Amino acid sequence: MTLILASQSSGRAAMLRAAGLAFETTAAHVDEEMLTASLRAAGQTPRNIADALAEAKAVKIASRLPGVTVIGADSTLALDDGSMLAKPETPEEAADHLRRMAGRRHRLFSAAVAARDGAPIWRAIGEAKLWIRPLSDAFIADYVAQNWDSIRWTVGCYEIEGAGVQLFDRVEGDPWTIIGMPMLPLLTWLRATGLAPQ
């Protein structure tokens, strides 16, 4: 049985490869910004939005590929005041996001949804709490300049498995959720369905 990751995230693909899974990747091309805005307007939480985005990606690809299992994944970031940060569109916006997060805690929700024949068949959501240390403007400017090509694709402007680890004082949660997918529940499910080695 074929497994597809409906994501262009290098971090998510690397996690699946490191776990020894055979899979293909394809982009779902879901309008994440529009869907997020609609869900926020409807009063949905960042946790539920991550789940809905992951489901939209998985279902979109699975509806075109009968019998294929598709994994959609997405992450959302919420500050303690309830506001959400999206992927930065410019280096200046990335710097602004980092200034807003500096010296504060935020919560990261990473969801994975499996779909087959156009319908969701499994889901899991992981949560991590992360504390970014106080950051100087000079550090932020240098960090963004050196890492823009990779952080532009992340909701928190960091890849914790790389230079982003320099941002943090404290982290609660598993590393896979922070990178972008609740791997342990996903692997348990994939083994139960025969899509991962027992």
UniProtKB/Swiss-Prot annotation:
Cofactor(s) the record lists: a divalent metal cation
Region forming the signal peptide: none
Pfam families documented for this protein: Maf
Gene Ontology MF, one: nucleoside triphosphate diphosphatase activity
SUPFAM superfamilies in the cross-refs: ITPase-like
Compartment(s): Cytoplasm
Active site: 74 (proton acceptor)
Example of a GO biological process term: nucleotide metabolic process
EC number: 3.6.1.9
Catalytic activity reported: a ribonucleoside 5'-triphosphate + H2O = a ribonucleoside 5'-phosphate + diphosphate + H(+); a 2'-deoxyribonucleoside 5'-triphosphate + H2O = a 2'-deoxyribonucleoside 5'-phosphate + diphosphate + H(+)
Alphabetized InterPro entries for the sequence: ITPase-like_fam, Maf-like
Protein family per UniProt: Belongs to the Maf family.
Function comment: Nucleoside triphosphate pyrophosphatase. May have a dual role in cell division arrest and in preventing the incorporation of modified nucleotides into cellular nucleic acids.
HAMAP family named in the record: Maf
Name of the protein: Nucleoside triphosphate pyrophosphatase
Organism field: Sphingopyxis alaskensis (strain DSM 13593 / LMG 18877 / RB2256)
